[in-house]
């Protein structure tokens, strides 16, 4: 795994254009900024082309979608393809809300996505496989997570991150698992949104190998969270959220390498 991409990201300070979830937009902006990327958000379709042109990558989040925003997503996705900018899709709650799944599938047919990042329920829904999702949470099911992720990647010809206690990253054939992290991520709304945008940041500095970028993104965020949790003396979700921003700013390649649990 090319963990030196973290240093590359910090040296290049890539702009990440986010069509954001308004519930978590501040956390995403702060996390990207701390890591070394430059976040930019917009809900205005009239400036879509300029935003795509100046960005290194685009992250499209379905968290708080509206009809107007869906139109913007479609325009932005097509422009990103036109200008050869990587696109990351976060299909929030598509496993629990049929309309969201309908929207996500329509977007995936309108433009090419480079990475889809979702939990088990979301990825299973896109792949057409059985899973009982629970709102924005993964829910439960009996399917093999690797097979679910691979099926989704093959169907949409992209890289897929099925995130959870162990992140599964696949391009449809190759598979990497990242087992770092902490249960405190599940107590912090927006952890998945932040991961999706961090993935976009890494694809901006590795556009020809988004599979590698996805792996590094998962390991950096999971590793940073694990390091924060190891210093806490109690279950403190709010402290974790604040300290995570600090750690994203300070974490080094060597620190991540030391604790990496990658299969």
UniProtKB/Swiss-Prot annotation:
This protein's pathway: Cofactor biosynthesis; thiamine diphosphate biosynthesis; 4-methyl-5-(2-phosphoethyl)-thiazole from 5-(2-hydroxyethyl)-4-methylthiazole: step 1/1
Gene3D superfamilies: 3.40.1190.20
Enzyme class: transferase
Entry's EC annotation: 2.7.1.50
Catalytic reactions of this protein: 5-(2-hydroxyethyl)-4-methylthiazole + ATP = 4-methyl-5-(2-phosphooxyethyl)-thiazole + ADP + H(+)
Regions that span the bilayer: none
Annotated ATP binding sites: 117, 163
One GO process term, biological-process aspect: thiamine diphosphate biosynthetic process
Gene Ontology terms, MF aspect: ATP binding; hydroxyethylthiazole kinase activity; magnesium ion binding
Keywords for this protein: ATP-binding, Kinase, Magnesium, Metal-binding, Nucleotide-binding, Thiamine biosynthesis, Transferase
Top-level taxon of origin: Bacteria
UniProt keyword annotation of Metal-binding present: yes
Database matches in SUPFAM superfamilies: Ribokinase-like (SSF53613)
Cofactor section: Mg(2+)
Residue sites binding substrate per the record: 41, 190
Role description: Catalyzes the phosphorylation of the hydroxyl group of 4-methyl-5-beta-hydroxyethylthiazole (THZ).
Family that this chain belongs to: Belongs to the Thz kinase family.
Protein name: Hydroxyethylthiazole kinase
